[in-house]
Amino acid sequence: MPLIKFKPTSPGRRSAARVVTPNIHKGSPHASLLESQSKTGGRNHHGRITVRHIGGGCKQRYRVIDFKRDKEAIPARVERIEYDPNRTAHIALLCYIDGERCYIIAPKGLKEGDKIISGPNVPIKLGNSLPLRNIPVGTTVHAVELKPRKGAQMARSAGSSVQLVAREGVYATLRLRSGEMRRVLAECRATIGEVGNEEHNLRKLGKAGAKRWLGVRPTVRGAAMNPVDHPHGGGEAKSGQGNPHPVTPWGVPTKGYKTRKNKRTQQFIIRGRRG
């Protein structure tokens, strides 16, 4: 998909770049697969900010995605490819032969009219979903489960994929795009192919307002705050942070400091993404 640039009629248009998506459905989404969403502004039930830089944005409805793909041995036809405002990937509307419809993450190369199916012994074909134990080693997959029948959790964003590199006993070894090597149970499902809309990272919003449409608020530097608001705040003019190392607003070291504490899943990571 090519990029489109605009005439420089304003600073925002001069910098903007959009991805051309001619095959995306231009009409309304399927009504029965929509749910309402309410904005939180990053606040919890006490009204306190728990996630910073969230607020505003266009009103959106959630598209219910079938991440489990547990409707086995029933063929489905791709009715159309749609835009989803809640994720970077596009979604595909499926129509099963029994009349049921559902949304899935659209793989790269999937198009209207294609036939796909889920099950333990289905063909190795783009869009088909089956357990890792039945997928040939070396195959590129996406929408991978971390626990059997829990639903896809890995490789769901635009352009992402995972490669099946080995199988040993009840485990399958996956190579992530980050370079991490990870083991998951071979009973976990995955979908053949990689996620579409791979040029999403090439787009340029062009102006701050476009980011606000997405519900993202500005990020203020700690050094620009007062001492009451941030450990880096205060001082005369543009003074330094005053700490031996940069910290978060809560005093935790940042910029390279490792904070991952999850011994329960560490045993499944064969090689980390940093080598």
Curated annotation (Swiss-Prot):
UniProt keyword terms in alphabetical order: Ribonucleoprotein, Ribosomal protein, RNA-binding, rRNA-binding
Recorded GO MF terms: rRNA binding; structural constituent of ribosome; transferase activity
InterPro entries in the cross-refs: NA-bd_OB-fold, Rib_uL2_dom2, Ribosomal_uL2, Ribosomal_uL2_bac/org-type, Ribosomal_uL2_C, Ribosomal_uL2_CS, Ribosomal_uL2_dom3, Ribosomal_uL2_RNA-bd_dom
Gene3D superfamilies assigned: 2.30.30.30, Nucleic acid-binding proteins, Ribosomal protein L2, domain 3
One GO BP annotation of this record: cytoplasmic translation
A Pfam family matched in the record: Ribosomal_L2_C
Matching PROSITE patterns: RIBOSOMAL_L2 (PS00467)
Example of a GO cellular component annotation carried by this entry: large ribosomal subunit
Stretch list, region Disordered: 24-47, 227-261
Disulfide bonds: none
Top-rank lineage group of the source organism: Bacteria
Function: One of the primary rRNA binding proteins. Required for association of the 30S and 50S subunits to form the 70S ribosome, for tRNA binding and peptide bond formation. It has been suggested to have peptidyltransferase activity; this is somewhat controversial. Makes several contacts with the 16S rRNA in the 70S ribosome.
Assembly behavior: Part of the 50S ribosomal subunit. Forms a bridge to the 30S subunit in the 70S ribosome.
Entries under HAMAP family matching the protein: Ribosomal_uL2_B
Similarity remark: Belongs to the universal ribosomal protein uL2 family.
Descriptive protein name: Large ribosomal subunit protein uL2
